[in-house]
């Protein structure tokens, strides 16, 4: 009889069983394989090929789920080339079609309801069918493989977890508030004992370290602070300690102050470590956004939107005003102008712009950031996604952000009227090139102005130079000159180039004033003409009324004459 081979994939490896083909013709297959003894009597293990690692298991199972024949499965099926008229039971019909297309195999793939019953029995009694395989090992391997397969289907990557960004930036803000509170409390507390040190040492971390190393003020002169402070500041502190006006404190007070100083030092070091961690995570999750707006602003945008995907789905107009919702709704309610920027205002590119150009640069930056966000959120830079042997490097991932930032910088320099820099030159937050550090120079300090002091006794006041005021020409005189002959105009035009720029500007201003005066005079003349016309119109009805009265009187006289004639 022709044999029947059963292909089963497990979390441990690929298994090939051999059985009689009559097994498929039985009606009570499900009842026969319910027990381990029954299924062991029907099936015999032909070959078991283990997975070398979890990555190999994921790759093999993923290809089987997609209905593809992997190289490992092909090598397993090569052992069945010599079998004639044999059948192969598979769980997936799609996989059976792919196996049927393999060259050199004469196997007939089978996948129906009876084979499903057989596979169900194999899964239930797998430890008894494969010697040396414990149930605990199978459950552990199945759990790990299922998680890996789920991540593969979702294309999940631990480097893409933006929840870490949201938590890190929130914790960073909280740390800043706590550090400011603790540092202020340390300075106020230790200031009772050594108040002069607060004016000399401005850095909170250095202040706390000095407290931990010096302790009481009397120990300042004998303590070496070279590893904490520069030499000149150390000298100033030691000199101030000799003449300090602070009060004395007990050892218990100092112990509590030192405990608080240790908190300041610990929080400061942790904040630095958290800041570097946040920068690394932002570079891994959103490299293009980081290049455009920076790691802190980018992290705040992601935290405000909730996730990287939500931010990538937002249009550029939303990204531009993200963080200014109160101002936006207030403007919409009062029908005023809407805000031009929100959190993006703190980006270095917007800070380089001045005045009215801030809104333009914020709009351009938001548009480029929207494109970069979609690349960061939706692109698959892994080796598996790209089909390459190695992962894509950081420069290639952030190439879009670098080129977009360079375009915005060039556009900004054009708007500001600054000379365009050659490509590849870095620009600092102040808008200047940072390719080469400038030479440090000592500038002259502002000197004391003794003339600004008050005068005592009969001391003479300092002489103040008085500027001579030049007499401006009157408007009437300019008007007369403008109405002169053409010969005078030609003479003036010949003289203008010989005068300085200031005199030419004054002449232009005087001419403009004359034009304004002429326009005003013309307007007044028009008004006077209109007033005369209105007066004539008001006199016209009176003249017409007198004419009518005269005609009426003449008519009455003629009627009286006619009556007299009729009487006669």
Curated annotation (Swiss-Prot):
Belongs to the NOP5/NOP56 family. It comes from the Eukaryota. This is Nucleolar protein 58. GO terms for molecular function: snoRNA binding; snRNA binding. InterPro entries: Nop56/Nop58 (IPR045056), NOP58/56_N (IPR012974), Nop_C (IPR042239), Nop_dom (IPR002687), Nop_dom_sf (IPR036070), NOSIC (IPR012976). GO terms for biological process: box C/D sno(s)RNA 3'-end processing; endonucleolytic cleavage in 5'-ETS of tricistronic rRNA transcript (SSU-rRNA, 5.8S rRNA, LSU-rRNA); endonucleolytic cleavage in ITS1 to separate SSU-rRNA from 5.8S rRNA and LSU-rRNA from tricistronic rRNA transcript (SSU-rRNA, 5.8S rRNA, LSU-rRNA); endonucleolytic cleavage to generate mature 5'-end of SSU-rRNA from (SSU-rRNA, 5.8S rRNA, LSU-rRNA); protein localization to nucleolus; snoRNA guided rRNA 2'-O-methylation. It comes from Botryotinia fuckeliana (strain B05.10). Residues 477-491 have a biased composition (Acidic residues). Its main location: nucleus. Gene3D superfamilies: 1.10.287.4070, Nop domain. Residues 492-540 have a biased composition (Basic and acidic residues). Keywords: Nucleus, Ribonucleoprotein, Ribosome biogenesis, rRNA processing. Required for pre-18S rRNA processing. May bind microtubules. It holds the Pfam family Nop. Residues 451-568 are annotated as: Disordered. Residues 285-417 form the Nop domain.
């Amino acid at each position: 009889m022709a044999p029947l081979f059963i292909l089963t994939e497990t979390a441990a490896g690929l298994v090939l069983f051999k059985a009689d083909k009559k097994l498929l013709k039985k009606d009570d297959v499900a009842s026969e394989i319910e027990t381990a003894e029954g299924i062991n009597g029907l099936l015999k293990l032909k070959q078991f090929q283990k997975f070398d690692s979890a990555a190999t298991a994921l790759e093999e199972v993923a290809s089987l789920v997609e209905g593809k024949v992997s190289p490992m499965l092909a090598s397993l099926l090569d052992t069945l080339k010599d079998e004639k008229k044999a059948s192969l039971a598979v769980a997936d019909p799609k996989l059976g079609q792919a196996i049927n297309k393999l060259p050199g195999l004469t196997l007939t793939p089978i996948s129906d309801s009876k084979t499903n019953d057989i596979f169900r029995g194999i899964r239930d009694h797998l430890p008894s069918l494969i010697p040396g395989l414990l149930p605990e090992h199978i459950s552990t391997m199945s759990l790990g493989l299922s998680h890996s397969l789920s991540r593969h289907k979702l294309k999940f990557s631990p480097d893409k977890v933006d929840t870490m960004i949201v938590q890190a930036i929130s914790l960073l803000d909280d740390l800043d508030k706590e550090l400011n509170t603790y540092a202020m409390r340390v300075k106020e507390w230790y200031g009772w004992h050594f108040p002069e040190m607060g004016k000399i040492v401005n850095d909170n971390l250095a202040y706390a370290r000095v407290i931990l190393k010096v302790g009481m003020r009397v120990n300042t002169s004998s303590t070496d602070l070279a590893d904490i402070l520069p030499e000149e500041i150390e000298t100033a502190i030691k000199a101030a300690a000799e003449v300090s006006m602070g009060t004395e404190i007990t050892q218990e007070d100092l112990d509590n102050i030192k405990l608080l100083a240790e908190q300041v030092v610990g929080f400061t070091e942790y904040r630095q470590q958290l800041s570097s961690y946040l920068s690394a995570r932002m570079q891994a999750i959103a490299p293009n956004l980081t290049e455009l707006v920076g790691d802190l602003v980018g992290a705040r945008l992601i935290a405000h939107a909730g996730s990287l995907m939500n931010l990538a789905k937002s249009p550029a107009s939303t990204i531009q005003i993200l963080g200014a919702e109160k101002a936006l709704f207030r403007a919409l309610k009062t029908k005023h102008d809407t805000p031009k920027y929100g959190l993006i205002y703190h980006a270095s590119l917007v800070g380089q712009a001045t005045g009215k150009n801030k809104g333009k640069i914020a709009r351009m930056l938001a548009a480029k950031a929207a494109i970069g966000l979609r690349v960061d959120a939706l692109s698959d830079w892994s080796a598996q996604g790209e089909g390459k042997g190695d992962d894509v490097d950081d420069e290639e991932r952030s190439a879009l952000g670098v080129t977009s930032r360079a375009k915005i910088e060039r556009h900004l320099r054009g708007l500001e009227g600054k000379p365009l820099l050659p490509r590849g030159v870095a620009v600092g937050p102040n808008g200047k090139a940072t390719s080469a550090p400038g030479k440090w120079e000592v500038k002259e300090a502002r000197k004391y102005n003794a003339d600004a002091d008050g005068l005592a006794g009969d001391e003479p006041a300092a002489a103040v130079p008085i500027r001579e005021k030049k007499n401006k020409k009157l408007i009437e005189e300019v008007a007369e000159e403008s109405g002169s002959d053409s010969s005078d105009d030609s003479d003036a035009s010949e003289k203008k180039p010989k005068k300085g720029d200031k005199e030419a500007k004054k002449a232009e201003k005087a001419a403009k004033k004359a034009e304004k005066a002429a326009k005003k005079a013309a307007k007044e003349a028009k008004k006077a003409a209109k007033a005369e016309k209105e007066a004539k119109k008001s006199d016209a009805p009176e003249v017409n009324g007198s004419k009518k009265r005269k005609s009426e009187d003449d008519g009455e006289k003629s009627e009286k004459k006619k009556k007299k004639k009729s009487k006669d």
